[in-house]
Amino acid sequence: YMLELKNLVFSVTLKDEKNNDQKIDIIKGINFTFEKGKFYAITGPNGSGKTTMAKLIMGINRQTSGHIFFEGRDISDLSITERAKLGISYSFQHPARFKGITFRDLLAIAGQTEDEEKLLGIVRRMGICPLSFLDKPVDATLSGGEIKKIELATTIARNPKLAIYDEPDTG
């Protein structure tokens, strides 16, 4: 399997109305395998744990218990950076905006290339007009849809083994 979740649990501790600690399970005992080369969509209502599960897989949050296996290797205790080096990539629901950096700069960093044709190819795959968009600054002047396309394009540019897209159609 590409990815396997075994008894995955994520809990938080909150204070109740009497200021006592109360443990709440956000993710409770998930077992699932993801096969290589397939596309999976995880759906559910707001607050059902979709983003939490994505962040657990990427290592942004740490599971309370259970294990995450990537290509047969237990990655449960690996950092975000170590998981990224293994080929896991995460596209945020609300991407960051940067002052003083262009879309071209971000793509070159993500794709580890400054080859104009490769960058233009990635931009075209996103349905973006490359000539007018490539040198735009990635800042507050961009719409939500534009910043989301930039986020998705940089994920594609990294050419990951496993890409996790959190709400790819928002923005």
Task: Give the residues covered by each predicted segment.
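The feature captures the beta-strand-to-loop junction immediately N-terminal to the Walker
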Residues: 43-45
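Helix-to-loop junction immediately C-terminal to a conserved catalytic motif
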Residues: 58
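Conserved ABC transporter NBD signature motif
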Residues: 66-73, 86
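Q-loop/switch helix immediately C-terminal to the Walker
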Residues: 94, 100-118
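ABC ATPase C-loop
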Residues: 155-156
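Catalytic Walker B motif of ABC-type/P-loop ATPase nucleotide-binding domains
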Residues: 163-167
